[in-house]
């Protein structure tokens, strides 16, 4: 079971419940899963959901997706091995974003990691340009450039003149305060939008390590130039193929 809105979901659910069904597979998102559970609470029908929210599972509801806490643990463990220490995190300002923040901070505390800078965006109408500027602290670094140019203009040395020539070709002054950017968005279209815009505000994927959730584990991600050097959580491809072969048999 999975549909685009609550009304269609409930309509289809009541329809299938009239049949003699043994199991319900779906939906994907935890809010819809909770609706299905509520409607079927008086029926002994197991539910297998594709959500990654382990908080909703119980003795009748099985969660089949990758657990968020496992994704974050694996991604950060791998990142530590690559000697990445300073991270920016981009998440929606909602329950999902709060879960990501909580899991990252718990991992941070247990592993003595120093820097995680969180940027939250409005999940209902994200301003991708404004959020991308906030991630890179663009306005402050732009002001730093203007300040540095004024400072050099007061000097009369050849060295200052040479530096001025270089600075006037730039948009900002100063390095980013993170080495890696973790993007846990609600859907892949948001990931695509951010990856297209972030480089314009100095978050260059050739210099900054992009890190993502299992949401990125789609063929579409391979077509996004901004994500070419990124890595993301995913099921083991060999085990997945074994499962698919068994399922087809």
Question: Locations of the language-model features?
Answer:
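Extracellular/periplasmic periplasmic-binding protein-like sensory domains
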Residues: 131, 136-150, 158-161, 176-180, ...
């Amino acid at each position: 079971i999975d549909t685009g809105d609550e009304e269609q979901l409930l309509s289809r659910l009541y329809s299938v419940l009239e049949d003699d069904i043994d199991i319900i597979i779906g939906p994907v998102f935890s809010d819809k899963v909770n609706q299905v559970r509520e409607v079927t609470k008086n029926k002994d029908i197991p539910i297998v959901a594709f959500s990654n929210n382990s908080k909703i599972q119980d003795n009748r509801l099985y969660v089949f997706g990758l657990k968020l806490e496992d994704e974050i643990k694996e991604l950060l463990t791998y990142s530590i091995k690559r000697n990445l220490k300073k991270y920016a995190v981009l998440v929606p300002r909602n329950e999902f974003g709060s879960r990501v923040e909580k899991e990252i901070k718990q991992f941070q505390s247990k592993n003595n990691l120093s820097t995680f800078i969180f940027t939250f965006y409005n999940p209902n109408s994200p301003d991708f340009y404004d959020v991308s500027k906030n991630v890179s602290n663009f306005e402050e670094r732009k002001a730093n450039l203007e300040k540095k140019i004024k400072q050099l203009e007061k000097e009369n040395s050849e060295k200052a003149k040479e530096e001025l020539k270089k600075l006037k070709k730039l948009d900002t002054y100063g390095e980013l305060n993170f080495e890696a950017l973790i993007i846990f968005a609600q859907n892949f279209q948001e990931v695509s939008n951010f990856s297209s815009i972030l480089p314009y505000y100095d978050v260059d994927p050739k210099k900054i390590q992009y890190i993502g959730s299992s949401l990125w584990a789609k063929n579409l991600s391979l077509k996004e130039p901004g994500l070419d050097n990124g890595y993301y959580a995913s099921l083991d491809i060999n085990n997945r193929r074994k499962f698919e072969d068994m399922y087809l048999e």
